[in-house]
From Swiss-Prot:
Pfam families: ZSWIM4-8_C. Residues 1-29 are annotated as: Disordered. This is Zinc finger SWIM domain-containing protein 4. GO terms for molecular function: zinc ion binding. A zinc finger (SWIM-type) spans 134-171. PROSITE patterns: ZF_SWIM. It comes from Mus musculus (Mouse). Coiled coil: none annotated. Keywords: Metal-binding, Zinc, Zinc-finger.
Length: 1101
């Protein structure tokens, strides 16, 4: 690798001096050119050791050029790169505040003594506050700030605004800064008297601070054997760093650790995750600048991540960490891969990092790559290997080692950059085959067209190299390697297609295939497809405005614009087209769904991220051609493509990718777009695994057993499948051929009733725009989908069934009377009887529906006849719940009403309950049909049985209503119902209540009625005498029953009961004699209950 490129300063140090333009036009003096190079690379101590005497002008130029010259580096160490809330405009970023202080003239008394810069910063206070004065000092060496000190109390990750202001002043106004040699050089020019005067004045000026230290040092110097006298020379803080000192930018390690710890403790908040991601971005920024602090900062962050107390808790519970935390760990692992793979790090640095990673990897709390701690979950891999027939692979999988988030980085430690072919690829855009062919390797190094390929390692590892090169500031080398990898993929695809053509007939006959890659590229821990796409897209990005020092801090992110950039050595190729090609290649790869909830979530998230990248690219004619070509290859890719004719049962579905391709291709090639999307509608994991021709006893059980516990994201996948179908239906509006093709695919592949219902609603909404006539074909498809939902959910009631049924009726209404009558005629395969009679028939015949259908009289009568037929059929199938609604619907048609009434009568003989019969009887009375009400009431009484102790039976009110109805109809009806009452009711209070009601005037007969002279019925004549005898007998039976197990606390209730019994006994002509005989019988029978009998005598004598 070439050495790091020299940084260019944003502005000339002499930029504010007069005559700057004239100086810029002249060549730079050789002294300055030499001093610049020395100042960048050599410590000043090394210069002094190399040359016995360095002239003062040379020393001054070296010291002058040793201060950092790039504002971008100052910005890197004074801004985290987060996006501030809207309206703040970066006021919290130290770099912005420091720039404002500089521009407002707040920097004063700047002095550079050797490699030490100092100055004062005056900052205006808030309202009513005095001006603040801060003293800032900066040490630097070899164009890097090595330490900072400021009087403010701001504690942040990076430099404060005052340090920024002083640094920017030194960069922009370098020649206005007073420059002195290191203080040791000045002291060496003084004689004894001058030195004594210097020391005394220094002590006098700062006696309160330095006097104790000065006295201690004086005592040690005067002591001959002291340690200070044994050391040659004296320290000079202004003389720069020594030869052995580390040369790196100042980084407050303690503050970084504290900040990460605090952010992790607030891990549930969105802002904490954003700030940690910003810190990761800062690490990448440092790596790109080839700053050694990138690795230092990553080590500090990793240590704090591993000390997160939640890790131990999650491990103890055997649970997975939160999604936000998991994503942060993924980013941490990816950064370590970039650091370990660094192409310019020293071997001892890499060894130290690998040792650290090895230690962390062995920790119990170190997160595993799949996202969870050790949980016993069913493994997919044995199933995969059994299908592919590879026993060796199964054994390897079963014995797979524990993989943590650092495993990939540890594996990267085994890689190197000294492969000769790899070096040739990275070195030149015009790398071509030589006479030696394969460069002495067994693997080919060029494709048949002479383009370099890279087969040295697995595809994800090769892509990690691309990401590493890009992360470390080698964008051109990253692009060269990315192109070689794409050439390799193309060559492999050609070989795969040739292999598939030979096996195509066999695979199609078999109807199944094994998965070709158990470790997919999308959702892979190394994100290979994302690495390639970002590297290629970055080369095509248009910079419409000057590059900002901190691009992420803009209040609103602009949509990125891309342009075609030609690939050197490949005419007609562009990086933008390659990015699109490789993204589609990765998204369309057939791959097995990984294990674990997080791994599956990651597949979905990674797919969405890649598609978001592609959606930023505006498609032109060249890219559309790439889309067409790749879509065709995906359709013909066989087992290597997720769009192939035959796919593995548990491969990742292509719905999301297909939706993007469909939308992109539709304006240019509708036929290809529909063929691709229809092919992607499959979700084979929901299909039963039984051989063709054998039906499963319960298909739902088969589906559920296949769903769990592995397919954690199945709900999400089904939703994406529904969205793809909805997009196709909307696009196919007006095209009968494709509409029916989409309908067939939906009916075959979508198995969720809820999603089918949503799809039907969407289709109906699309088919009935407010400002245009409806699309009848699409409406018919919406209705067909609704009918399928009804059939699927007929025997599995859901809380949304009523909503679905109502919607189906409204959809059929939109189509017209034939559709509405069709669902009424075929109701038995779609609805329950209750749904059909209470929702379908009622909604279909409302006034609003009739107006909507705009039917004439004959059409209305036909619809009513259909509804009445439905009602009668429902009443016959479920009279218990449908009889009354059927009668209501048939009110206006005498024949239908009579038929419904007859169904009720027949059902009464077949066991229709008394409660339903009473309900229908009351309805008949309300309709003015008392005789029919009476008939139904007698049928209900015949089924009723009320025991002696059921005073509060639910049917009490119905019985009293039936008695009142019979009383109002006349003596004949009353005489007929009395035997039923006596046979069905054995409750004495209830019988006496009925008896008293019948002794009053008949209800409904006013004083002017035709029977106003009729006398009230007497209890001494039939039919009431029979009821009186039954009531008396019931009281006698109930009394004996209660006395059998009576307790003293119920004596009072029993006395009240006897009081009511006496009232009933007295209704008979000889009632007091019967009651007296009854009491005497009680006294003789229960003479052992002396207290109770005493109470009876006291009350009744």
């Amino acid at each position: 690798m070439e050495p790091p490129a020299a940084k260019r300063s944003r502005g000339c140090p002499a930029g504010d001096e007069p005559g700057t333009g004239a100086r810029r036009s002249r060549p730079e003096p050789l002294l300055d050119l030499s001093a610049k190079r020395v100042a960048e690379s050599w410590a000043f101590e090394q210069v002094e050791e190399r040359f016995s005497r360095v002239p003062e002008p040379v020393q001054k130029r070296i010291v002058f050029w040793s201060f950092p010259r790039s504002e971008r580096e100052i910005c890197m160490y004074s801004s985290l790169g987060y996006q501030p809330p809207e309206g703040e405009q970066d006021t919290r970023v130290p770099f912005t505040r420091g720039l404002h202080l500089l521009q407002s003239g707040a920097v004063d008394r700047v002095l550079q003594v050797g490699f030490h810069l100092s100055g004062n910063i005056r900052e205006v206070g808030g309202p009513g506050e005095p001006e603040h004065l801060y003293h800032v000092s900066i040490s630097f060496d070899r164009c890097k700030i090595t330490s900072v000190s400021c009087g403010c109390d701001n504690r942040d990750l990076f430099y404060c605004a005052h340090v920024v202001a002083l640094s920017l002043y030194r960069i922009r106004h370098a020649r206005q800064v007073e420059l002195r040699l290191p203080i040791s050089e000045t002291l060496s020019q003084m004689n004894r008297d001058q030195l004594q005067k210097f020391v005394q004045y220094l002590i006098s000026a700062h006696h309160t601070e330095v006097l104790p230290t000065a006295q201690r040092l004086a005592d040690e110097i005067l002591l001959l054997g002291s340690e200070i006298n044994l050391v040659h020379g004296a320290p000079d803080p202004t003389a720069g760093a020594g030869t052995e000192d580390a040369n790196c930018w100042h980084l407050d390690e303690e503050q970084i650790q504290e900040q990460v710890k605090q952010l992790l403790s607030n891990g549930g908040h969105y802002g904490a995750s954003q700030q940690l991601r910003s810190m990761f971005s800062k690490v990448r920024e440092m790596l790109r600048a080839r700053d050694s602090n990138g690795a230092r900062m990553l080590i500090l962050m990793t240590e704090q991540f591993l000390q997160d107390p939640r890790l131990a808790l999650w491990r103890q519970q055997g649970a997975g960490m939160t999604d936000k935390c998991r994503q942060l760990w993924d980013e941490l692992g990816a950064l370590w891969v970039c650091v370990i793979l660094s192409p310019h790090c020293k071997p001892d640095e890499r060894s130290g990092w690998l040792q650290l990673l090895g230690t962390w990897d062995k920790l119990d709390v170190c997160p595993l790559e799949e996202g969870n701690y050790s949980l016993d979950i069913p493994s997919l891999q044995p199933a995969l290997t059994s299908r592919t027939g590879s026993e060796d692979e199964e054994e390897v999988t079963a014995a797979s080692p524990r993989r943590t988030v650092f495993s990939r980085a540890l594996q990267a430690g085994e890689l190197h950059w000294n492969d000769s072919h790899l070096q040739r690829i990275l070195a030149s855009d015009s790398c071509g085959p030589t006479l030696t062919g394969s460069m002495g390797s067994d693997k080919p190094t060029f494709d048949p067209q002479g383009h370099p390929i890279w087969l040295g390692e697995p595809f994800p590892t090769a892509c990690a190299r691309v990401d590493t090169l890009r992360a470390h500031g080698y964008p051109h080398k990253a692009l060269r390697l990315a192109c070689a990898i794409i050439n390799t993929l193309r060559l492999q695809r050609r070989h795969q297609l040739e292999s598939y053509k030979q096996q195509k007939k066999e695979l199609l006959q078999k109807g199944a295939t094994g998965v070709t890659s158990t470790e997919g590229w999308v959702g892979h821990p190394l994100d290979p497809i994302g690495c390639l796409c970002r590297a290629l897209l970055e080369a095509c990005r248009l910079e419409e405005e000057p590059h900002s020092l901190f691009p992420d801090s803009a209040p609103e992110k602009r949509k990125l614009a891309y342009q075609h950039v030609l690939v050197p050595g490949s005419p007609g190729e562009s990086y933008l087209a390659l990015a699109l090609e490789v993204a589609l290649l990765g998204l369309g790869q057939q791959r097995a769904l990984p294990e674990g909830l997080y791994a599956q979530d990651k597949v979905v998230r990674n797919e969405e991220q890649l598609l978001a990248l592609l959606e930023e690219v505006e498609l032109d004619e060249r890219l559309v051609q790439v889309l067409r070509k790749q879509a065709g290859l995906l359709l013909e890719g066989g087992p290597f493509s997720g769009f192939g004719e035959v796919i593995f049962r548990e491969s990742v579905p292509m719905h999301t990718c297909a939706r993007y391709l469909f939308t992109a291709l539709l304006p240019h090639d509708p036929d290809l777009a529909f063929r691709l999307a229809l092919r992607a509608m499959r979700l084979p994991v929901l299909e039963t695994t039984f051989p063709a021709g054998e039906s499963h006893p319960n298909p739902l059980d088969s589906i559920m057993s296949n769903r769990f516990p592995r397919w954690f994201i199945l709900g999400h996948l089904e939703t994406r499948q529904c969205e793809l179908a909805s997009t196709m239906l909307t696009a196919a509006k007006g095209d009968t051929k494709w509409l029916h093709a989409v309908l067939g695919s939906v009916q075959q592949n979508i198995h969720s009733p809820a999603l089918l219902f949503k799809l039907a609603q969407d289709a109906c909404k699309t088919a009935t725009p407010a400002s245009a006539p409806p699309d009848t074909v699409l409406l018919g498809i919406a209705l067909e989908l609704g009918l399928q939902v009804m059939r699927m959910t007929l025997n599995t009631m859901t809380w949304r069934r009523r909503e679905m049924v109502r919607w189906l009726v409204s959809c059929a209404t939109e189509i017209g009377p034939p559709a509405l009558m069709s669902i009424m005629k075929n109701w038995y395969s779609l609805f329950t009887p209750v749904e059909a009679v209470t929702i379908v028939a009622v909604t279909g015949t409302t006034h609003a529906t009739l107006l909507r259908l705009q039917l004439d009289t004959a059409g209305r009568e036909e619809l009513w006849a259909c509804a009445r037929t439905l009602a009668l059929q429902c009443a016959m199938k479920d009279p218990q719940n449908c009889a009354l609604p059927a009668l209501t619907l048939c009110e206006k048609n005498h024949a239908a009403f009579e038929a419904a009434y007859q169904i009720v009568l027949d059902a009464a003989a077949g066991g229709l309950g008394h409660a339903h019969l009473f309900t229908v009887a009351r309805y008949m009375e309300h309709r003015g049909l008392p005789l029919r009400a009476y008939k139904l009431a007698t049928l209900a009484l015949a089924q009723l049985s009320i025991a002696f102790n059921q005073d509060s039976h639910p049917a009490v009110n119905d019985v009293l209503w039936a008695c009142s109805l019979s009383h109002s109809l006349g003596r004949h009806e009353l005489s007929a119902i009395v035997p039923l009452i006596i046979r069905s009711i054995h409750c004495a209070p209830m019988l006496s209540d009925i008896l008293r009601r019948w002794t009053l005037s008949a209800p409904g007969l006013g004083p002017l009625g035709a029977r106003r002279a009729t006398k009230p019925l007497g209890t001494d004549r039939a039919p009431l005498c029979q009821l009186l005898d039954a009531a008396v007998a019931a009281y006698i039976t109930t009394s004996h029953s209660r006395l059998t197990h009576i307790s003293p606390r119920h004596y009072g209730d029993f006395i009240e009961f006897l009081g009511k019994a006496r009232e009933t006994f007295l209704l008979a002509p000889d009632g007091h004699l019967q009651f007296a005989q009854f009491l005497e019988n009680l006294k003789q029978t229960y003479k052992g209950k002396k207290k109770l009998m005493l109470l009876v005598r006291e009350r009744f004598g």
